[in-house]
Amino acid sequence: MSLAVEYISDKTPCQRCSTKDAVLLARRENYCGDCFIRFIRGKQRRSMQDEAYKVKYKTVENPHRVLLALSGGSSSLVLLDAVASLLQEQAGQHGGRQGFALTVVNVDERERLKLDKSFQDIISELKSRYLPVDIDFVSLDYDMYVDGRLLHHIKVASDFSSYSIPLNKGTNINDILKGCNSKSSEEDLLSIILNELLLKTAITHQCGTLLYGHSMTRLADEVLALTIKGRGSTIHSSVLDHTEEISGQTINVKYPLRDVLMGEIEAYCKLAKLDSVVMSSTIPDPVINKNKTVRGLTAQYFRQLDATGYSSTASTVVRTAAKLAAPTVGTKSGTCKVCGVEIRQDPHQWLRRITVAENEKVENNSEESGEIGADKKEDVGEQIDLCYGCTVTIGDAPSFRWPLSDKDIIAEYTLDSDED
């Protein structure tokens, strides 16, 4: 039992270089600051050893472009620092050439999370820190996901069948979230929107790779949260490098920091002096557990494990989840119209089997009894496919709206990029 990182105050030599004093103990080894930073960067570089990321001396018409998702949190900033340092080394060793082009994208959450700084506030510092590397910075908004032409009202009936009715009026993301029954449902839907926005941005900017800065602790948190929310079929793609096929294009999705614990991320931030650009929420964590979201509870669980010396639990969770594969049971019967996941087993049939229906009233005339428990299809709309997770998330929300479209169709929207 040990903490992920323990700082050293006495004079102890670094076990890597033997020339400097160690500043911390991690994974049973003493590191000086430079060696620890090099150790963490090595994790990222091992995950990006393909030829696509190496320097080419021949003229390439369309150089490989990488999209890096930057939330402004410590993990994504550590990933940016590691990737940018790789590009700096390539430029220094190969006459200014880079192995790939880098685009950094941020989805604006300053208002929702009450962040202490905005993405625009840190761009200039990031640019100066990573000179002479040329990095494109792109800012997105959740409302870019909402296409009024595709907007539908979605209703889950008492028998768990799902229906949609086209809407003529526009809406924004805040209106959509108001239709949720809980903070956990809001959080779940925002994660769907975020992933779709990033994939669409990768296509728009002709990026062949999408990088997430999730640490091992964050991925373990995600595994538990997905299980609780009934989205177990997506666990394999949430912890492992994989590909996404969209509009005939292939996007390589990678998690370069999947072997790095959160305690190690925080130590890297401190040693690399990244704390000044970390975007932190000013909203205090709810004290009462019932006011926390599912992800808030799972994150709290792993923070407590880290604090009590059981940080290796996250490694066990992620390694176990990595053994999972894409669902193969049954044949594909449809695609969820909200999250885009393949449906192989009817979730509505399962929900009907485990749910006890309310008792019907005995005193009814024939006309009333014919309407009990039955939804009039002409009032409900067209039947659509929803996965188990989305059926539970939407639940009995009285007024839930969502833009329905096939996952591989890219809606038109505008991206704000920093070209300076």
From Swiss-Prot:
Molecular-function annotations in GO: nucleotidyltransferase activity; sulfurtransferase activity; tRNA binding
Name of protein: Cytoplasmic tRNA 2-thiolation protein 2
Keyword Iron-sulfur: no
Highest taxon above the source species: Eukaryota
Lineage: Eukaryota, Fungi, Dikarya, Ascomycota, Saccharomycotina
Pathway connected to this protein: tRNA modification; 5-methoxycarbonylmethyl-2-thiouridine-tRNA biosynthesis
PANTHER family (UniProt xref): CYTOPLASMIC TRNA 2-THIOLATION PROTEIN 2 (PTHR20882:SF14)
Compartments it resides in: Cytoplasm
Keywords: Cytoplasm, tRNA processing
Any one cellular-component term (Gene Ontology): cytosol
Function: Plays a central role in 2-thiolation of mcm(5)S(2)U at tRNA wobble positions of tRNA(Lys), tRNA(Glu) and tRNA(Gln). May act by forming a heterodimer with NCS6 that ligates sulfur from thiocarboxylated URM1 onto the uridine of tRNAs at wobble position. Prior mcm(5) tRNA modification by the elongator complex is required for 2-thiolation. May also be involved in protein urmylation.
Cytoplasm is among the record's keywords: yes
InterPro entries tied to this protein: CTU2, Rossmann-like_a/b/a_fold
GO biological process terms held by the UniProt record: protein urmylation; tRNA thio-modification; tRNA wobble position uridine thiolation; tRNA wobble uridine modification
Family: Belongs to the CTU2/NCS2 family.
Native organism: Meyerozyma guilliermondii (strain ATCC 6260 / CBS 566 / DSM 6381 / JCM 1539 / NBRC 10279 / NRRL Y-324)
Pfam family, one: CTU2
